[in-house]
Amino acid sequence: MPYPEQFIAPMRAELTRLGVRELRTTADVDAAVGAPGVTMIVVNSVCGCAAGKARPGIALALQHDRRPDVVGTVFAGADIDATDRARAYFEPFPPSSPSVGLLRDGKLVFMLQRSDIENRDARQIAERLTAAFDQYCESPARST
């Protein structure tokens, strides 16, 4: 049973207020991944490491001058089908939330799993993400 929307709405808003697009359906996920360039998909979560580490780290990383062309998010435990679709693009990595995947032209090029998040602070997570942005994003972001 999905989480009640009124419970998770503030957690969704932590990313959407940064310009991150919600990907609530499989079609939304496929469209984001099919966009040219680099797509970042965040698997958002209710857990403490999402609240205290992942979302703040993503917020810091998105201030970097070089960012993915498309930035989207699914919510584990709420956007069930969309989350499953995003995780299918993240194979061979096992399902993990929170997590962040970078895809270039539909192919996974970078993955940040829960195990990479839970023992780091927001600044360290941002550093990992911005290093990946510098490596895989060809130019400053056009849109989110």
Please report, for each region that a protein language model flagged, where it lies by residue:
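Short acidic (Asp/Glu) patches
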Residues: T83-S97
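Local sequence-structure signature of Cys/Sec-based thiol-disulfide redox active-site neighborhoods
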Residues: A31-D65
